[in-house]
């Protein structure tokens, strides 16, 4: 399987064509709403990037590339679970990644507490479940894996198994 992660900021048409031709899964970082994304991911000149990233996702999808949206859940994202779900649900495949503090023990402006992450997951799961019951299913990797495990199936996420194979990182 070929997979790559990108911030989605500057992908050329040639690179997108390559991903399509070689059947890559592309994970694109989009941290919720434009407001929450732009807070942590401005460009080098300090300008917002959410609209550029959203256009890149559309270009990838139009080319037939499989796309997962990767959303880092920090303290700001965690305050807006419903808005974040609504912003990302149209992309259908979402991975939420908690933003943990470093090992230095320093708390930062964007730090995510365990309580805030739990509240985010609970409200997001309610939205996920509602979308499913209304016939608008969205794949949220953690939820999909936890449900599979509760049903006695193994998770597809190797981290939830406790062992991952080697990956080439460039």
Which sequence ranges carry the predicted segments?
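Canonical radical SAM enzyme core domain
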Residues: 1-36, 43-55, 71-83
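Radical SAM enzyme [4Fe-4S]-AdoMet core and its adjacent flexible, acidic
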Residues: 39-51, 58, 62-170
